[in-house]
Every structure is written in structure tokens, then in C-alpha cells.
A protein has these predicted regions:
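Phosphate-handling DNA/RNA-contact segment within nucleic-acid enzymes
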Residues: 7, 48-152, 166-167
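Acidic beta-strand-to-loop metal/phosphate-binding motif
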Residues: 112, 150-162, 181
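A residue-level signal for conserved active-site and pocket-lining positions in enzyme catalytic cores
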Residues: 29, 69, 155, 188
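RNase H-like two-metal-ion nuclease catalytic core shared by retroviral integrases
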Residues: 165, 185-194
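Metal-dependent DNA phosphodiester-chemistry modules and their immediately adjacent helices/loops
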Residues: 182, 192-209
Length: 209
């Protein structure tokens, strides 16, 4: 009798499937400063041939959440303005912290930002260890415990009231936060595209670290 695949195995299978179609997203990704090499390293993909139950995600960017044990979740982002909603998650799956492997790589400090693309930008394109949350209101108490040991936590906040509120919420959590808010209407990725990696390092005073 054939044994059914575990949830972990199903996620790994889906990730590998979608990663094989990542080239379909390269026009979008390169427009946001994400190279093919970075996309491959983060195991980004496109839902071209959906796994069973993933039919609603066809044509979307697949963003895997990867831990030491492997793929633990996949979120799906619209690649065109007509795709609504912009982000979709799998039913019944609670949001998680993105790019948690950077927690072990980081030393005295780490960055936090909203969104997977922003976190990927800081981590892989700028060289700043970073974790990302699924949205400005998605912070959870156990995330705080994961970051408790850092001397500095740089919050790269979106350039809007929600972004500032998100950063202030992390201060209330007791983390040693330095707020780095982007200009109005901008986010971390858009400022990377416009001004490059050095701008984002300088904003945090990390240009010499």
C-alpha cells in the first residue's frame, strides 16, 4: 500500500515544482532588483502546474518559508495588478516569520521589515540579516522571544502610518528597536531599486559594518 505524503513532504514537492517555473517571474523580480541567482537561493517559484489544492494560486509567485527542517509554508503573491488579493496563504495555516535562518546567521543585530520581498532585499541583496512579517499587524509574541538576544533590532518601516505603527509596536514589545522609516509612499525594496544597497546600509549607520 502506498504511503501518503506528509505535510512537510507535500510542501517540499510543491516548492520544487514551482521553483522549476521561476523564470516566468523574472521580469517582475528583476524589476524589483531581485536577480535570478537570488530568486534561486530563496527558492522562489511560479505556480504554473499547481499541486492538488493549489489551483487558486495559478500564475502567482510562490514564496516558501524555509527553516532548518525544510519548507514549512508557502505564500503566494500576485504578479500582475489584476490579481486579487495581492497575497494569498494556504487555508488554515497561520502566518509565520519569514527568513528565520537569518536569526542564526546574525550576530549582535538584525533587521525586521514588512513583507517577504523587503526581507529578501535586505538579506540577499544588501547583506543585512533580516526577518519579515506578513503584514504590519502580523507580529506575534513568540517572534519577540526569537529576537530577545539581539543588542539592536533595526525596523525598516514602510513609508506610511501603518509602517510607523508597526515599528512602535515592536518598541512596546521591549525590543531594542531603531526605527528606519522609508520616505512617504516607499518601502525597503522600492528604495533599494531607486538608491541601491548603500543607501539602506547608511540609513541604519551600517555602512562601516
Amino acid at each position: 500500500m502506498k504511503q501518503s505524503l506528509s505535510q512537510k513532504e507535500l510542501l517540499e514537492k510543491a516548492c520544487a515544482n514551482y521553483q522549476a517555473s521561476v523564470n516566468l517571474a523574472l521580469p517582475y523580480l528583476t524589476g524589483r532588483g531581485i536577480t535570478a541567482q537570488v530568486a534561486q537561493s530563496a527558492r522562489l517559484g511560479v505556480v504554473e502546474h499547481p499541486e492538488i489544492g493549489h489551483e487558486a494560486y495559478v500564475g502567482r509567485l510562490a514564496i516558501p518559508y524555509i527553516t532548518k527542517t525544510g519548507v514549512v509554508d508557502i505564500r503566494f503573491r500576485a504578479l500582475t495588478p489584476d490579481q486579487e488579493p495581492k497575497y494569498m496563504g494556504m487555508p488554515g495555516v497561520k502566518t509565520k516569520l519569514y527568513n528565520v535562518l537569518d536569526i542564526e546567521k546574525a550576530k549582535d543585530w538584525i533587521a525586521v521589515c514588512e513583507g517577504e520581498i523587503d526581507a529578501l532585499t535586505l538579506s540577499r541583496c544588501v547583506g543585512i540579516p533580516c526577518v519579515g512579517v506578513a503584514g504590519a499587524t502580523s507580529w506575534k509574541p513568540h517572534y519577540t522571544r526569537l529576537l530577545d538576544d539581539f543588542e539592536r533590532v533595526y525596523v525598516y518601516a514602510d513609508g506610511d502610518s501603518a509602517g510607523l505603527s508597526f515599528a512602535k509596536d515592536l518598541i512596546k514589545e521591549g525590543l531594542p528597536v531603531t526605527i528606519i522609516q522609508m520616505p512617504e509612499g516607499e518601502d525597503t525594496n522600492s528604495m533599494f531599486v531607486k538608491n541601491g544597497a548603500e543607501y539602506l546600509r547608511e540609513r541604519a549607520g551600517l555602512d562601516n559594518e
